[in-house]
Structures are given as structure tokens and as C-alpha cells.
Amino acid sequence: MRVITAPPYYPQWQVGENYSAWRYKREEGAATVWRCPLYVPKQPSTLKRLLHLGSFAVSSFFPLMAQRRWKPDRIIGVVPTLFCTPGMRLLAKLSGARTVLHIQDYEVDAMLGLGLAGKGKGGKVAQLATAFERSGLHNVDNVSTISRSMMNKAIEKGVAAENVIFFPNWSEIARFQHIADADVDALRNQLGLPDNKKIILYSGNIGEKQGLENVIEAADRLRDEPLIFAIVGQGGGKARLEKMAQQRGLRNMQFFPLQSYDALPALLKMGDCHLVVQKRGAADAVLPSKLTNILAVGGNAVITAEAHTELGQLCETFPGIAVCVEPESVEALVAGIRQALLLPKHNTVAREYAERTLDKENVLRQFINDIRG
């Protein structure tokens, strides 16, 4: 297996230590990995994000074309970013490989839903982006994506149903099964979180599509309750949120950097209530990957999603799996938090769902069978 990717930079929007944003790097191991240079903005705006994605599409094109001699059987491209699909399709044509375009986020739909394309769906930017997306989706052998509603969206965009594959985000279920209380207590002490207060946890990217301003509002309304809002992660919107919390004097809200891979099970078990927040219009274009591990740990999540979306349907189909509330409503978010805090700390519905449907080995085995045809 060969992988062409970028140096690690997300969600901090900063290239990791021992990596470079300006040089190629080849790594040998179970797979041969080429790390391609790219532009990484410190504060990503719409224009800077496009330059960021475009820079990777250009830098990755050359090592991608070098794989022609290797003659791959399958080429799997991951979206974001759509900018790389022309190169993927060209390599497939030259090598005779079959192609799979895997959709983590519908970039264009998310951009339109969050109003980042100027004049909306009728504007020239939106029309150009939609045409580019259509070309990518219609000229690969298979399209895979992470939810049933996103599969339906691919079909609505003109992909033949028989060419759409379900490839959900997985969880390493065993990691979240037996988490020692001592590990949770140690992490809690390390972060300086008091034992006598319940933890409202948000862990993940801090960007535009989450709408975390409402979490600030919720913390303000709950400032007299024995709660701590712990915001863990990085992203372009973090500094602004920290400033908002400081201006309001929110002593019940604390911000922390992204925690290590090894600390994740203890971090998630520590949360009495988990926040899975998105703006209206993003819920079917993107499916939060953080939810899989929250379910695996048996956490009680408050999800902001409309009833007809994938997340809304999940909560309706599996009663008790999470608390689903109206997006962009502070009142609904506060009510959802209060409801979640009344539930038993361990959510058996969530854990059992994760065991049945999200186990990493099962998900990968099925995907391999699907792309083999």
C-alpha cells in the first residue's frame, strides 16, 4: 500500500514537530508514505482555506503521477479535498486502476450551508464548485461515504446507487471498554478540574461549522450550577471563543489543548455530558467523527441536529442513544444538557450500538469486500 498525504497539521492548523510545510518527506513502514508540502494558514478564512487545499492538490500531483510504474489496483481519494480528484482520475486512466472517492464531508454543501460562498447557490463561485464536484463524483468507479443520508445525497447528485458504498467512521471499541478510574482521576487532576463539579465536555475541532458560540451562551446561563464546561481541542475559532468567555467572566468554562491519543479514553469517560454541536445546514453535509468514540465509551451526548438529518434519525431509531436538540437554539441546548445530566453516567444504549456497528475490524473488513466487488 502507498499513501500520498500531507504532514500532520489538523486541528491545530500548525504543522507537527519533525515535519515541514515546505519539503517532501518519504516514510517507510507497513505502507510507503509520501508527505507533500502545503500552505497551512494560522487563521483559515474561506480564501485561505481554498489556497490551502489547492496547494496540496498541486504538490501531491507529482508523487501521484510517479505511481504509474507501480500500477496500483485501487486508488482511493479522500474528500476533503475535491481538488485532488483530477490527478486521481488521470493516474487511474494511465495505470488501469479502479477508483474510489471517499466522502468525509461534502465540501460544497457545507460551504453553501454555512454561507461561505458569497451569493449562495446562485452565485458564480457556487456554480463553479458544484460543477467541479459533479465532475468528480460522476467519473470514478465508486463513491463511499460515512452515513446513510450522505449515501442518499450522492445518489441525488447523480451517482448510480449500485456504485455507492457505506464506509462509516469506526471506533477502536476495545480501547473504550475497560477504562480505569485511576486514569480518569489522574487526567482530571492534571487538567485541574474539581471533583465536586460535573463536566460538560466538548472535544474536537473548534471551527466555524460547529457554532460553539451557543456553548458560550449556555455556559453563561448555567454559571451558577455545579458544572464545568471543558473545551478541548484546537481550531481557527478557538481564540475568539476564549475571548468571548473571558469578556463574560465565565469561571465555569475552561479551554485545553488537544489531548494525546493515549489520553482519549480517560478524557471521554471523564465527561458527564458530551457536546456534539453543529450549525443548522451542516448536519447532513458532515457527520461528526467524534461521536463514534463518545458512543464507544458509553457517554451521554447532546447532539444539535434537525429531526430529518442522519443524527436526528439516529436518535429516533435508537431511543436513549443521545439527546437530540434543535440546532442554533441556546434554550434547547441548555435543556438538553440538563436532560443528559439526569441520565445514568454509563449509557448502555450508546455502548451497545457502538459494539454492533462501529467496531474497526468489522467496518474495514466490509469495506474491503465492497471495493473488491
Feature map (PLM): residue ranges:
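Carbohydrate-associated surface elements
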Residues: 7, 149, 170
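Membrane-proximal helix-turn-helix segments that form the acceptor-binding/catalytic region
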Residues: 65, 71, 83-86, 90-95, ...
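Conserved donor-binding/catalytic core segment of Leloir-type glycosyltransferases
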Residues: 194-210, 216-219
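A charged, aromatic-enriched C-terminal amphipathic alpha-helix characteristic of glycosyltransferases
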Residues: 327-328, 332, 341-371
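Nucleotide-activated donor-binding/catalytic signature segment of Leloir-type glycosyltransferases, i.e.
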Residues: 226-233, 238-265
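A short helix/loop element that forms part of the nucleotide-sugar donor recognition site in Leloir-type
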Residues: 19-24, 177-193, 348
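Nucleotide-sugar-dependent
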Residues: 210, 257-295, 301-316
